[in-house]
Amino acid sequence: MKRKITLISVTAVLLVCAVCIEKFCQLPVWQLLIIYLVPYLLIGFGTLKEAAEGIFEGDLFNEDFLMSIATIGALCIGFLPGAETEFPEAVFVMLFFQIGELFEEYAEGKSRDSISHLLAIRPDVANVERDGKVSEVSPEDVAIGEIIVVKPGERVPIDGKVIEGETSLDTAALTGESLPRDISVGDSIMSGCINLSGVVRVKTTKVFGESTVSKIIDLVESADKNKSKSESFITKFARVYTPVVVMAALTLAFIPPVFAGAGFMASFPIWLHRALIFLVVSCPCALVISVPLSFFGGLGAASRRGVLIKGSNYVDALANLGVVVFDKTGTLTYGKFEVEAVHPDDFDEHELLHLAAHVEHFSTHPIGAALRNAFPAEAVDGCEVTNVEEIAGRGVRAEAAGRTVCVGNSKMMDDLGVEWHDCHLAGTIVHVAVDGKYAGHIVISDVVKKDSAEAVRGLKRLGVERTVMLTGDREAVGKEVAEKLGLDEYHAGLLPADKVAQVERLISEKPAGKVLAFVGDGINDAPVLKRADVGIAMGGLGSDAAIEAADVVLMDDKPSKIAEAVRISRRTIGIARQNVWFAIGVKVSILALATVGFGTMWMAVFADVGVTVLAVFNAMRALSAR
């Protein structure tokens, strides 16, 4: 870019000198041509070379070709009888063309910088423990199960589990969140994050190629391959448009003089001048550059907020969102169970929870984890539990504190012949029997995410007409969550195949021109994510399925970012449309003026380079989309 700035500056100085020489020195036309050829070739050699190479490679009709024939024509027109020289105009057109390209390069660089911060998350080395020594190796050379050491300030190279130490992680490059994430022994650690404080030893759970950082880099690098409808149209349009423009210019130059009353040679310079203006004005740079640049800026703006969109075609889709379907667990809720209520039956409440937590101490079921978390670990350790038996589809039976305790569902109570009581609360009901008598029940519920309600409200404000929740939970649970969040409808008790069927039904019912998005956690939702018009995966940090199956990946667990992605997409589409209509409007106006003789080469320069620069700056607004 520095070289181009120098070239433009030197050309501008030489052009001013040439204009002064022409004004104050009465020189023959051929000498003036030589003087003007110096700045012309200095600034235009690259364009002329590209045009020539395009001719030999079969890419005849491009902007370099248009600029070349227009400026060469302007240089030659002065040698025609009765025509005025247009040497300064020829150099000015080429100079401003290069200035326009300079602004384009700058804007494209800014747009790419907005995404390149994600490519910078790739780690260079991994510190691996081998034979009692720590050595630096390439992340690609680390196998699953090896121990790596991550020091403060270093980027985590590979996914794994912390086996020693505790620290805070900076996940801003992935999620857009400024708050650090605390981790300790037993926690998963994702590649691409920066270790902020303590030294941690990590046991790798994936090879580098399958780690989060590799998946994200692959996603970002391929994002510009999926073009939007607008981009695809502009690309096809330019292929047809440019040859048509050249033919129209030739027609304008040669046909009117044939029918002119003054004779062909007398009127040919006038119409040739108009044809050259026509060529300069018709250059499609503003459209070909600014529209893709708008979408690239939108992708960058979204990525900075932790929303990875796999291509600008999905920006198009998000802008037309009409129906949003949510999976419940892990999407609108945390997918972590907590004890909501304890209802004893002629039994002490504390004792009921105490015994249930003891019996579930060795269970791997999420309900067991919720019960253990609800009771202090030291109390659990102080009680002897024997003869633990986990009964599939029923619950757990064990001896605790000299009593036979059964913790499970209503089917377990029926098998024991124990009369149990139903509960008016929604959630998972865990019944407890002690020594063959009903002791009460515990209500365990999935916790709704803090910003789930705001996510639904945000989508409503943006005009999304229908919000739906699908869940495999009971009817009562689904109803409670749907009412709490203000969803339009819900469907409970669904198997994975049922969810696909529901999405297909909703797609058939959606309004024409609208898009249906399915939002899931990416763990067991791959079939539905693929079936929806747009698949949005929550919590991309650590979910391979999310990155593989979805079209849009939210790198954290905030469903409210869906509305943010929609806002960015709509703003991006709006900016692209502004550029299209502005460029077409100005060009058509000046083309009309040029055809009837009121256009000038300076107007043509503005219609081409000026419009391109303005469109590029407008496209850069997509980078700051909110």
PLM ranges: what are they?
Residues 1-125, 227, 236, 243, ...:
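Transmembrane helix-loop-helix hairpins at the membrane interface
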Residues 26-37, 61-68, 82-93, 233, ...:
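Membrane-water interface of transmembrane alpha-helices in multipass transporters/channels
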Residues 92-152, 183, 309, 477, ...:
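Juxtamembrane coupling segments of multi-pass membrane pumps/enzymes
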